[in-house]
């Protein structure tokens, strides 16, 4: 009888955790998948970047990368983009997690290897325009190195042409690269002037130590660089996941899901 009760409680806990995940993720997933508002916002971000690009190219005194401090004025221009929810739309994977009541990273590699992610709205027009103006395109992603071929295939299937003589797709773990993207931005900055950057997470723009920090610290850093937003830095919305969420739980990923939900509820500001 005792063993049966223990087994029942384990099943109940798993069911509750799955329900909590669905509760937290379903509206965000539907917003990205189905809302006209999400589509319009993404188009707006990339159209704004298209409008800004000529003036940014002409002003060689500016770099978009905080790692690039000097001697960049005469280097050829480049842009850096994150991949997931910035260039490639993986919202179908989020929908799978909800329907199967599972959690990332379960099924993630398999999804990537299907090579069927679509472009985020607006990004194709930007990539085409930047290429037309002679701007090199680099993707700095925290997809792991084993997914490089699948990611490249997916992008090529969507029409992107890898034309630089050097690696344009810089993956986590490809070399001695962790999740902090500053070393990969610095690598690009050795040979190019970085004129714009795009992402859906603060770490796509700043050092990881500032990104993986409290919500208050992240907001302070964001405000510190307010002159960059909309000119050189372009943020895509991602209500599904990111370090904005992790900062609320203090990056304590092992905290039980029920406790994580309560922490998030407690963080709500009702004025």
Model regions: which residues?
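Bacterial Sec-dependent N-terminal signal peptides
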Residues: 1-26
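Non-catalytic pre-domain segments flanking phosphatase-related domains
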Residues: 17-81, 250-271
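Short, acidic loop-to-helix structural element flanking the phosphoryl-transfer center
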Residues: 109-138, 145-146
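Surface-exposed patches in mature extracellular/periplasmic domains of secreted proteins
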Residues: 57-69, 137-142, 164-167
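C-terminal cap/substrate-recognition subdomain and adjoining C-terminal extension
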Residues: 47, 148-271
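Active-site neighborhood of HAD-like aspartate-dependent phosphohydrolases
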Residues: 76, 87-118, 132
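Sec-exported extracytoplasmic/periplasmic mature domains
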Residues: 54, 58, 93, 128-136, ...
């Amino acid at each position: 009888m005792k063993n049966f009760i223990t087994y029942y409680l384990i099943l109940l806990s798993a069911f509750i955790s799955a329900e909590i995940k669905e509760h937290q993720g379903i509206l965000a997933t539907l917003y990205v998948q189905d809302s006209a508002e999400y589509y319009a916002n993404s188009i707006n971000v990339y159209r704004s970047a298209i409008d800004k690009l000529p003036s940014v190219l002409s002003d060689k005194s500016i770099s978009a990368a905080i790692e690039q401090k000097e001697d960049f004025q005469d280097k050829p221009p480049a842009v850096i983009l994150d991949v997931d929810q910035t260039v490639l739309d993986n919202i179908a994977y989020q929908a799978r997690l909800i329907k199967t009541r599972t959690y990332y990273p379960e099924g993630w590699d398999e999804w990537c290897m299907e090579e069927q992610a679509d472009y985020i709205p607006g990004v194709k027009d930007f990539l085409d325009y930047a290429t037309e103006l002679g701007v090199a395109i680099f993707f700095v992603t925290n997809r792991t190195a084993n997914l490089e071929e699948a990611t490249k295939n997916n992008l090529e299937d969507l029409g992107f042409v890898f034309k630089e003589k050097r690696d344009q797709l810089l993956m986590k773990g490809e070399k001695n690269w962790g999740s902090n993207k500053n070393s990969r931005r610095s690598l690009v900055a050795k040979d190019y002037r970085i004129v714009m950057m795009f992402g859906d997470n603060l770490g796509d723009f700043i050092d990881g130590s500032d990104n993986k920090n409290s919500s208050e610290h992240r907001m302070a850093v964001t405000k510190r660089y307010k002159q960059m937003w909309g000119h050189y830095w372009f943020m895509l919305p991602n209500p599904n996941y990111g370090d904005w969420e992790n900062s609320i739980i203090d990056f304590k990923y092992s905290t039980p899901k029920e406790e994580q939900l309560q922490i998030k509820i407690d963080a709500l500001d009702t004025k």
